[in-house]
Regions:
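N-terminal low-complexity/disordered regulatory or targeting extensions
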Residues: 4-7, 165, 186
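Short, well-ordered loop/turn elements at secondary-structure boundaries
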Residues: 128-131, 138-142, 151-152
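Segments surrounding the PLD/"HKD" phosphodiesterase catalytic module and close analogs
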Residues: 143-177
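A surface-exposed partner-binding patch
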Residues: 1-127, 131-134
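General helical structural elements
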Residues: 87-89, 165, 180
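Structured loops at beta-to-helix junctions and adjacent beta-edge loops in soluble globular domains
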Residues: 58-59, 73, 136-138, 148-149, ...
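Low-complexity, Gly/Ser/Thr/Pro-rich intrinsically disordered linker/tail segments
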Residues: 182-192
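Short amphipathic alpha-helical interaction segments
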Residues: 127, 138, 172-176
């Protein structure tokens, strides 16, 4: 896989910088065996995108990366933002192909009020990110999603519902949806 070879070369090139980012922790978690990955796919009735599968089996199952770093495969199926930490349903299709947000958010008077908890709970429900792994925490409750089921299979999306900004695809300079490999390669290329 070309993006994985490129990422490996950049890891070697930027090793000192990655060490500083990791702050003496492991740069990458241990890789997963293909057998464990296949078991995960079988248990969740999905197939992981090939570039992501190569990354977690050849480079690391989580570690340094965009935002606050990559989550492990196991941690990526839990929505850490919600109090009850629910599992994300992977065998249902991701429902979006274009940016999404609730219409009421644009017209809400944020200076004088706060939405009722029932409305917020519906907005934050994991059904909005079905078919996705939460692969990285961006900060301030935002998360990067990797679509593993649905039309957007293999593409990375940004979930900014924590600040009421909705869910949107991560785009490259040509305004095109990007894959996991492209997303990670772009991050590591642009490290200073």
């Amino acid at each position: 896989m070309d993006s994985i070879k490129y990422i490996k070369s950049k890891i070697i090139e930027k090793r000192d910088l990655l060490d500083r980012i990791a702050k003496n922790d492991l740069i990458y978690n241990s890789v997963l065996s293909l057998e464990k990955i296949q078991q995960f796919e079988f248990e969740n009735n999905i197939e992981l995108p090939q570039d992501y599968k190569c990354f977690i089996s050849e480079i690391g199952n989580g570690g340094v990366g965009p935002g606050l770093g990559l989550k492990s495969l196991h941690d990526s199926i839990i929505d850490f933002k919600l109090r009850n930490r629910p599992y994300i349903c992977l065998n249902k299709k991701f429902p979006y192909q274009n940016k999404w947000n609730e219409p009421w958010i644009a017209s809400f008077d944020w200076d004088d009020d706060y939405p009722e908890s029932e409305i917020v709970d519906k907005y934050m429900n994991t059904k909005h990110i079905s078919g996705c792994l939460q692969i990285a925490h961006k900060g301030h409750g935002g998360t990067y999603l990797l679509v593993v089921n649905g039309f957007e299979f293999g593409n990375v999306w940004l979930d900014n519902r924590a600040d009421y900004s909705g869910i949107s695809p991560v785009l490259n300079k040509e305004n095109r949806h990007i894959t996991f490999g492209e997303w990670y390669a772009d991050w590591i290329t642009n490290l200073i």
